[in-house]
């Protein structure tokens, strides 16, 4: 029996600090996502989103601070009463007044945050590190006394002084937090910086490390993955990455990255086929389109156009796909209605239409399609019309013998018969 080949994209076997095969998700669509410019979630919509996330399998659902507004408090209490499998968290300032309200809502844990960079200490709360440490200890001990989880996070971690960061994390770790948080609040960090900070922090604290990455410079997914490689265990995500400014690590995008590195873990833990429905739910709620190049669910995500690509995909999808669309309840699509098409793609379309043409005839009709494609944009109906007209012209009793040479359906990769729909923004 041939031994299975090792996954070249997996964590290195000897890297015992890596959590690529042992990570957890904190979904913040109902906290960070509420800070997205278009977001307004009423109670009913929050409950619908929370149930969908729970069904998908996220480990934690983070909610807006109950002191943000009276309705925020009521919504927090309502979601806590749903009996979800996911643990419910709320996100508060490092302040006793906030903590006293939060612990009475029924949450499973409280996420405490305070700015530690010189920018936030000067222009936000105006406090020094001694005050921050004292406040953190007071709030943490109070929350712990209520028997619920507690996370302490610095805000703007990557623009904070490293000595200040390590000192505050050592302080809170000693009194027993469940985890400490690293927040790239302005999206300035790159993967190398993330890896180095996480590895340094791992030598200082014994608790789990949670990471929160903004996407201002396009590194949120890469930073999240690198954080797990470095030893962080929990990653904050939101559906479609919605959040303050241009958001944080997207749930679907991170799943695309993680299934490559840890396929067995990801497939066994999360209902990946639910991603499309969850993204549609949230996209409709905030009135945005799902981007065409969105990992997994973008309408071009599994579309192949160039002739040489199509030929290889039809023979073995792994030639041009690192992700299997079937893992996500999706189908690949060969875009054959264009001048770049190849005869193998047209042959697949001929088979879908249940027509019989020889390879030479398929090459001939392909030339006709490419010729028209040089003149104008084509659609599926154009190509089907050319194929059917050509078939009618050449049909003879001899052509029927081509049936004997057709592949069985099981030998041909499953293809979508029409391209994925282009989403349009819902009307107001």
Curated annotation (Swiss-Prot):
Residues 399-428 are annotated as: Disordered. Present with 28100 molecules/cell in log phase SD medium. Its main location: cytoplasm. It is found in: Cytoplasm. This is Homocitrate synthase, cytosolic isozyme. Catalyzes the aldol-type condensation of 2-oxoglutarate with acetyl-CoA to yield homocitrate. Carries out the first step of the alpha-aminoadipate (AAA) lysine biosynthesis pathway. The lineage of its organism: Eukaryota, Fungi, Dikarya, Ascomycota, Saccharomycotina. Pfam families: HCS_D2 (PF22617), HMGL-like (PF00682). It catalyses: acetyl-CoA + 2-oxoglutarate + H2O = (2R)-homocitrate + CoA + H(+). One of its GO terms (molecular function) is metal ion binding.
